[in-house]
């Protein structure tokens, strides 16, 4: 727990104090956000606001992980507190960094062209598929080599699983490794695009991501306290995951980094996360779902992202089939803007929806544990 607290604190402070530096640097470089002409009229006043702020909280998360991981060396149980970084950490941070890199290319092209059209859809899609495939393979083909004091292998879990999972793996829904990689690519694409579509109002995606990441920190830490690699727990209700403390540490670090960034990103935003931040957060959240064996729980934890994504899907299907639009504008937050809601009201109310999804998911997670124990 100390390591997680260290990671959260370091991430928050790095993000809080480095974001103003990023604002000055990006302003000097004229890295301002272009605004779509067809978007809400009230957004034109945001034109030129520094973007690519996701670089800050991605960097803060990595730095905080290093600090938190070093704190693990003070724990008495060297079996769990390995000094070297785990593959789990490399997969999760890799997903965040390289998904963010795809977004950075998109942001860079937007700034360079002075136009809201950056990386084309095919290029962005290819980048997401490549990131998902590479880290999906790593997650599924590299089992743990953790040993106990007698040199006996105690946990042979991979970061990911070939079994579809809700709160735990579901044995009846076993996939091939190729099928599992394809599933993971889909989850990465869904999560990155979900966060990206949500990132349309000041602080909206950042605040929602804080809740989702905090939920995963709690889930992973609970799994660590009831881990199958711990001989004090029986196989009936322990969790078969790999490196849950590392997962909790990274989730907590990312949540803390987002809180620090939110200080500057809340309305009126002085900086935007850009696709750099949105895709980076989406990649990390996808990795959290995979590594904690909660893939089918993700649509509930990230319920706001699902609702906003579905509003876009519904709008497209409706317009193409009937020629009519269901919403004034999609994604959903812009519909309410055009309906006369203030930006702050929309953000706070959508945060409430995000919080409800997180609360339901945590309730289901804990209820399943109680049912297993009972």
UniProtKB/Swiss-Prot annotation:
Keyword Manganese set for record: no
InterPro entries: Glycosyl_transferase_4, PNAcMuramoyl-5peptid_Trfase, PNAcMuramoyl-5peptid_Trfase_CS
GO CC field: plasma membrane
Enzyme Commission number(s) of this protein: 2.7.8.13
Keywords linked to the UniProt accession: Cell cycle, Cell division, Cell membrane, Cell shape, Cell wall biogenesis/degradation, Magnesium, Membrane, Metal-binding, Peptidoglycan synthesis, Transferase, Transmembrane, Transmembrane helix
Compartments where located: Cell membrane
Residue stretches spanning the membrane: 3-23, 52-72, 85-105, 125-145, 170-190, 201-221, 244-264, 271-291, 294-314, 350-370
One example GO MF annotation: UDP-N-acetylmuramoyl-L-alanyl-D-glutamyl-meso-2,6-diaminopimelyl-D-alanyl-D-alanine:undecaprenyl-phosphate transferase activity
Name of the gene: mraY
Function according to Swiss-Prot or TrEMBL: Catalyzes the initial step of the lipid cycle reactions in the biosynthesis of the cell wall peptidoglycan: transfers peptidoglycan precursor phospho-MurNAc-pentapeptide from UDP-MurNAc-pentapeptide onto the lipid carrier undecaprenyl phosphate, yielding undecaprenyl-pyrophosphoryl-MurNAc-pentapeptide, known as lipid I.
Cofactor(s) essential for the protein: Mg(2+)
Pathway the protein contributes to: Cell wall biogenesis; peptidoglycan biosynthesis
Catalytic activity: UDP-N-acetyl-alpha-D-muramoyl-L-alanyl-gamma-D-glutamyl-meso-2,6-diaminopimeloyl-D-alanyl-D-alanine + di-trans,octa-cis-undecaprenyl phosphate = di-trans,octa-cis-undecaprenyl diphospho-N-acetyl-alpha-D-muramoyl-L-alanyl-D-glutamyl-meso-2,6-diaminopimeloyl-D-alanyl-D-alanine + UMP
Organism name: Salinispora arenicola (strain CNS-205)
GO BP field: cell division; cell wall organization; peptidoglycan biosynthetic process; regulation of cell shape
Protein name: Phospho-N-acetylmuramoyl-pentapeptide-transferase
Uppermost EC category: transferase
Recorded topology in the membrane: Multi-pass membrane protein
Cell division found in the keyword field: yes
Family: Belongs to the glycosyltransferase 4 family. MraY subfamily.
One Pfam family cited in the UniProt record for this chain: MraY_sig1
């Amino acid at each position: 727990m100390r390591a997680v607290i260290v990671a959260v604190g370091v991430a928050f402070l790095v993000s809080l104090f480095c974001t103003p530096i990023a604002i000055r640097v990006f302003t000097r470089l004229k890295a301002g956000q272009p605004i779509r002409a067809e978007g809400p009229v009230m957004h034109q006043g945001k034109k030129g606001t520094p973007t690519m702020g996701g670089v800050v909280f991605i960097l803060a998360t990595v730095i905080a992980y290093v600090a938190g991981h070093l704190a693990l060396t003070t724990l008495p149980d060297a079996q769990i507190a390995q000094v070297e970084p785990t593959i789990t950490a490399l997969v999760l941070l890799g997903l965040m960094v390289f998904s963010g890199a795809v977004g950075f290319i998109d942001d860079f092209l937007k700034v360079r062209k002075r136009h809201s059209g950056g990386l084309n859809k095919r290029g962005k899609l290819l980048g997401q598929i490549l990131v998902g495939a590479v880290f999906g393979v790593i997650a599924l083909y590299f089992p743990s080599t953790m040993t106990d004091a007698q040199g006996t292998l105690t946990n042979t879990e991979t970061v990911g699983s070939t079994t579809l999972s809700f709160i735990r793996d579901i044995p009846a829904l076993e996939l091939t490794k190729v099928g599992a990689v394809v599933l993971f690519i889909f989850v990465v694409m869904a999560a990155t695009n979900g966060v990206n579509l949500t990132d349309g109002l000041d602080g909206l995606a950042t605040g929602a991501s804080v809740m989702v990441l905090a939920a995963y920190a709690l889930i992973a830490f609970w799994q660590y306290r009831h881990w199958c690699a711990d001989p004090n727990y029986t196989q009936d209700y322990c969790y078969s995951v790999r490196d849950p403390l590392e997962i909790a540490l990274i989730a907590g670090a990312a949540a803390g980094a987002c809180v620090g960034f939110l200080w500057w990103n809340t309305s009126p935003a002085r900086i935007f996360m850009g696709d750099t931040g949105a895709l980076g957060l989406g990649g990390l959240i996808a990795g959290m779902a995979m590594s904690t064996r909660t893939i089918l729980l993700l649509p509930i934890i990230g319920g706001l992202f699902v609702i906003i994504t579905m509003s876009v899907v519904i709008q497209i299907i409706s317009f193409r089939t009937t020629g009519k639009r269901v919403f004034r504008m999609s994604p959903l937050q812009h519909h309410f803007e055009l309906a006369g809601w203030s930006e702050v009201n929309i953000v706070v109310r959508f945060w409430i929806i995000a919080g409800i999804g997180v609360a339901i998911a945590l309730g289901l997670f804990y209820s399943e544990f109680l049912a297993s124990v009972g």
